[in-house]
């Protein structure tokens, strides 16, 4: 065994061994417990960042631990390879997105391998390869024929300069992020998934996921947004509108119907269009609304604006005439593009009514009283007893809901209805680097799905996009085709799918990645699914995790899988954060400096009190800790860390510095500490092995001092097993190993028994560290005399006998202050413990002359004598 710990050699040797032995290749083994551990696959951006390293290290530790429990563990990896960044990089570097993507995958795969991850690389999937996305297209055609996918016009952000659709986040202050052109709202035909058909099931089956964080389930519940409310119809005032009809609104507060003082409609509403005829000012306002953001979040925060029309509708219960306004806060796609406004009990309506001097009528008695003041109070939105509501006065919310519904039903002007906030999922993207939508547009047959024997519709890979619209739409060789039904000249769809589609089913493809008769081999899929442990960032709580759950149900309904949910347990790992440093630039912006380029000064408590740039020695501002990012220039390159310290040190630091679901603060001194600890383990093992391996430990012959050491070893195994197995608290499990190391380093090595005990201790340390630092554990296990590999070793088991104590030490307090200690047999009775405490020499000094009122005994811990 080499005297020095040399991570580079040790890690290369372990990785070579795993490769040659195909240690992580996995097959279905009926009868053996399976465990499917999956970390969210990365986008091949070019190189790994610390967030990736943390995510994959956590997954790997769990996978390796489960393998040590004797399970058949699947841990695959792949690449979420379609998407905008490849197009942007392609334009910047004048290179085809395919070339850029495949080169990035090659480099990042090497990086992942250097971390020593226990991945079955034979199952690798790459979503931009035709053998992957052909099955996505196959499923699309099935769902299109079933009507679960349909085509309709959707409102999008249109960049007139680039002739392309922009995502909400690509619109900055109303302009295109690349062209700077003013963005228009435009209606274009798009494909949609009917995810709303599954809204109830997606909501209800969240209750079948006890292994998910409550926070994520709450976010999904809110996103689906089920609300019971009422559909209310306001009859048109024929004198002003000119024809019969009703304005339909949806409200979750029908109890406030008697307080409605106006109605507001979206800019796209037919009444808005009618009112704008011959009213240029209103038409200009409608155009302004239409060019605004289509994002709901922006709608909520933007200034509420409106314009009156000359139109009126009638209150369904009182017949009172209410004015129709056009307002920018009403969404055409929520409810029916119109709202009844109750300014006394809705904050948005209140702001609007005050701005435009519209009447406010209180109809609910709240904790703020019966009146509504000139400033909004949260209490105005409360449920309460009805007032100023004619025959409904005195009813509470539930009573009013039922009574008002009955009144509306009698007049055929309303009924209760369940509404969802969730919208159908629009998946059409006017982009090049995505999965082609397998539809052919025929002048006589309409939209025809591409037949199965013509799949995949392959994306041409030698294209360099220029940013102006979709390149596919300018490639006749791609879109010119004949109709599969009638044979006439037809046009292929040139839109590609939202890249969230690929990541909605990849977890199932890993079960049979090379299966060529379908999307999955149902036998293999049902053997492995659902995923036992899924690991990824909280930022995917809604979209990705909701779409994956939806897709799993689609696959179930196609007979491909039998389970209802894709991921049994979910761990959302915290961010990796680091210090930030900057100087204010001449233009008022900030120039950020990487922590590696900054010399820092700390106070006695290790708090940073000053910082200077190494190059010029001048001060820089301290910006506090933030998520590692390019924009703040506070990232640490994992590759440089692995090269400097080895993968095991990086893994140990990552797992020790914080629990997996909390933020991890990067610290160079913490990495140093992890490296020092592994060197200590190596040094102790090397000194031990160099003396020759000892014989078997004779547990029955241990003296008291040896029993204490063995108790420490087994107490650590017990605690670490609980921490890792039940709570994923790897940081506290590592702390247990460190405690044992402190004991072992001080342990005597004089006799054969001493050395046999040290052997047991070092084996326990090696096994407890094996999932976390697999390379050093691989080497130590061999040097400690084992023929097999540590990856095939079992997790250490606790010898409960070792934990039994013959005697225990209790502290003795007088009136809560420590005054002595007594050593007692572990089986001593309460009376014996109390007698020993009272007769302790030091304790006697403090109770002399006092009356003992009571004696509190906490078994195994302490005795407190209360005296005065």
Curated annotation (Swiss-Prot):
Residues that bind ATP: 630
GO cellular component: cytosol
Enzyme Commission number(s) of this protein: 6.1.1.4
Keywords of the record: Aminoacyl-tRNA synthetase, ATP-binding, Cytoplasm, Ligase, Nucleotide-binding, Protein biosynthesis
Main localization (coarse): cytoplasm
Subcellular location per the Swiss-Prot or TrEMBL entry: Cytoplasm
A molecular function (GO) term: leucine-tRNA ligase activity
Protein name per the record: Leucine--tRNA ligase
Organism: Pseudomonas putida (strain ATCC 700007 / DSM 6899 / JCM 31910 / BCRC 17059 / LMG 24140 / F1)
């Amino acid at each position: 065994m080499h005297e020095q710990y040399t991570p580079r050699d040790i890690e290369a040797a372990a990785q070579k061994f795993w490769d040659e032995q195909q240690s992580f290749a996995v097959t279905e083994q009926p009868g053996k417990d399976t465990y499917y551990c999956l970390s969210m696959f990365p986008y091949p951006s070019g190189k790994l960042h610390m967030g990736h390293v943390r995510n994959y290290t956590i997954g790997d530790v769990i996978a390796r631990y489960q393998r040590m429990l004797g399970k058949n563990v699947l841990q695959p990896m792949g690449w979420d390879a379609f998407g905008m960044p490849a197009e942007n990089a392609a334009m910047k570097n004048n290179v085809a997105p395919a070339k850029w993507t495949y080169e990035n995958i090659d480099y990042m795969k090497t990086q992942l391998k250097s971390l020593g991850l226990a991945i079955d690389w034979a199952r690798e999937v790459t979503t931009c390869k035709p053998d992957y996305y052909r099955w996505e297209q196959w499923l699309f055609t099935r769902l299109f024929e079933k009507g679960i996918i349909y085509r309709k016009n959707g409102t999008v952000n249109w960049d007139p300069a680039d002739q392309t659709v922009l995502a909400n986040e690509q619109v900055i202050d109303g302009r295109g992020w690349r062209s700077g052109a003013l963005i228009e709202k435009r209606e274009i035909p798009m494909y949609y998934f009917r995810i709303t058909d599954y809204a109830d099931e997606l909501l209800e089956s969240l209750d079948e996921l006890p292994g998910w964080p409550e926070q994520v389930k709450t976010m999904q519940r809110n996103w689906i947004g089920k609300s019971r409310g009422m559909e209310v119809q306001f009859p048109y005032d024929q004198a002003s509108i000119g024809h019969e009809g009703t304005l339909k609104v949806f409200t979750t507060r029908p109890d406030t119907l008697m307080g409605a003082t106006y109605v507001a409609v979206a800019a796209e509403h037919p009444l808005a269009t009618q009112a704008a005829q011959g009213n240029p000012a209103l038409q200009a306002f409608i155009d302004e609304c239409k060019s605004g953001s289509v994002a709901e979040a922006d709608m909520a925060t933007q200034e509420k604006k409106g314009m009156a029309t000359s139109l009126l509708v009638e209150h369904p219960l009182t017949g009172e005439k209410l004015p129709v306004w056009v307002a920018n806060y009403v969404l055409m796609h929520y409810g029916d593009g119109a709202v009844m406004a109750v300014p006394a009990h809705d904050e948005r309506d209140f702001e609007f009514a005050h701005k435009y001097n519209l009447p406010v009528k209180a109809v609910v008695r709240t904790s703020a009283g019966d009146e509504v003041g000139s400033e909004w109070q949260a209490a105005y939105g409360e449920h309460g007893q009805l007032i100023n509501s004619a025959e409904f006065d005195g009813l509470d919310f539930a009573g009013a809901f039922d009574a008002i519904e009955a009144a509306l039903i009698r007049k055929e002007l309303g009924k209760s209805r369940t509404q969802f906030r969730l919208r159908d999922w629009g998946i059409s993207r006017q982009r090049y680097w995505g999965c082609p939508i397998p539809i052919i547009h025929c002048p006589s047959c309409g939209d025809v799905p591409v037949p199965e024997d013509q799949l995949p519709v392959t994306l041409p890979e030698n294209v360099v996009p220029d940013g102006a619209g979709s390149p596919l739409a300018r490639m006749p060789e791609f879109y010119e085709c004949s109709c599969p039904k009638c044979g006439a000249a037809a046009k292929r769809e040139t839109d590609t799918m939202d890249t969230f589609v690929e990541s909605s089913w990849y977890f199932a493809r890993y079960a049979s990645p090379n299966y060529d008769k379908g999307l999955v081999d149902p036998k293999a899929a049902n053997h492995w699914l659902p995923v036992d442990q899924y690991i990824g960032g909280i930022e995917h709580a809604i979209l990705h995790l909701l779409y994956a759950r939806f897709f799993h149900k689609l696959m179930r309904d196609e007979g491909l899988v039998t389970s209802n949910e894709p991921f049994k347990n979910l761990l959302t790992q915290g961010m990796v954060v680091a210090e930030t440093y900057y100087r204010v630039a001449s233009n008022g912006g900030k120039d950020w400096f990487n922590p590696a380029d900054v010399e820092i000064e700390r106070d006695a408590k290790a708090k940073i009190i000053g910082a200077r740039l190494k190059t010029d020695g001048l001060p820089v501002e301290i910006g506090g800790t933030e998520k590692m990012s390019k924009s703040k220039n506070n990232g640490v390159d994992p590759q440089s860390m692995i090269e400097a310290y080895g993968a095991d040190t990086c893994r140990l630091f990552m797992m020790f510095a914080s629990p997996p679901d909390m933020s991890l603060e990067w610290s160079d001194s913490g990495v140093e500490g992890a490296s020092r600890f592994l060197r200590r383990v190596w040094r102790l093992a090397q000194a031990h092995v160099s003396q020759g391996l000892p014989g078997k430990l004779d547990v029955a012959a241990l003296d008291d001092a040896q029993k204490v050491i063995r108790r420490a070893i087994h107490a650590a195994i017990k605690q670490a097993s609980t921490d890792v197995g039940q709570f994923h608290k790897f940081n506290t499990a590592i702390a247990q190993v460190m405690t044992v190391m402190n004991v072992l380093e001080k342990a005597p090595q004089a006799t054969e028994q001493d050395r046999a005990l040290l052997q047991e201790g070092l084996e326990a340390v090696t096994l407890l560290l094996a999932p976390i630092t697999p390379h050093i554990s691989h080497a130590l296990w061999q040097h400690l005399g084992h023929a097999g590999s540590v990856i095939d070793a079992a997790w250490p088991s606790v010898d409960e006998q070792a934990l039994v104590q013959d005697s225990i030490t209790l502290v003795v307090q007088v009136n809560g202050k420590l005054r002595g200690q007594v050593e007692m047999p572990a089986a001593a009775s309460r009376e014996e413990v109390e007698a020993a405490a009272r007769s302790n020499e030091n304790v006697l000094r403090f109770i002399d002359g006092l009356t003992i009122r009571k004696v509190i005994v906490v078994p195994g811990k302490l005795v407190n004598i209360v005296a005065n």
